[in-house]
């Protein structure tokens, strides 16, 4: 279970869309947006989000049963396990991500410090929200939109549809590509992340509420008494 928790944290912070489902009926060839257009369109899409709340389902799958899991010390069964929970976002920089099943874990930041809390292990990791952490997929929805061009190369395969694929510009990034798709309500509906180990992480959002009222205390964290605090 401890390894599962470490994997969940890695998927969420350092590694965290489903590839958009495309119709097999072809009416016309899609016209891709230029990189500048794609970036501008994504920034505009994200700018609609002041606050956001949703339930999520997150599943990671390996392209081969033995390859990636062996490197991570996980079995194929673990790699295909689905995590469920809730997330809340408030711009700028506030993020709450709580997994409720099968292992409970909370990741929260008020914009300066990231806390990763595991109640079963009675352990909390405290990490500074530096530029590297701020550019991870899980914080894309709450981060500074002006940094997108600096951190990612953005593509929009069909400029008539609201899904985008982002490629990190840094060479040592934990993921190779990130696809994010938005629904008719202008809120994110799903994300897919592909990493260098041949693994694909799918995050589906449901019960999405765009710009709801969220208490500021949601993004504050105080470790319970007796919690082992680890600074990174």
Give the positions of each predicted feature.
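C-terminal segment of classical bacterial N-terminal signal peptides
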Residues: 15-27
């Amino acid at each position: 279970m401890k390894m599962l928790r470490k994997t969940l944290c890695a998927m969420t912070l350092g590694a965290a869309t489903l590839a958009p489902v495309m119709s097999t009926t072809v009416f016309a060839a899609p016209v891709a947006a230029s990189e500048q257009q794609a970036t501008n369109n994504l920034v505009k899409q994200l700018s609609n989000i002041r606050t956001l709340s949703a339930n999520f389902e997150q599943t990671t799958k390996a392209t081969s049963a033995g390859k990636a899991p062996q490197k991570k010390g996980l079995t194929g069964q673990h790699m295909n396990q689905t995590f469920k929970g809730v997330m809340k976002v408030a711009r700028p920089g506030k993020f709450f991500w709580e997994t409720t099943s099968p292992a409970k874990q909370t990741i929260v930041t008020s914009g300066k410090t990231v806390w990763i809390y595991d109640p079963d292990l009675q352990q909390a990791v405290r990490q500074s929200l530096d530029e590297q952490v701020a550019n991870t997929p899980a914080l894309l929805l709450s981060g500074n939109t002006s940094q997108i061009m600096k951190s990612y190369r953005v593509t929009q395969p069909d400029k008539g549809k609201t899904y985008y694929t982002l490629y990190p510009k840094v060479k040592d990034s934990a993921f190779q590509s990130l696809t994010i798709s938005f629904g008719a309500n202008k809120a994110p509906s799903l994300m897919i992340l592909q990493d260098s180990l041949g693994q694909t992480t799918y995050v589906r959002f449901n019960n999405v509420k765009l710009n709801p009222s969220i208490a500021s205390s949601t993004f504050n964290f105080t470790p319970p008494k007796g919690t082992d605090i680890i600074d990174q």
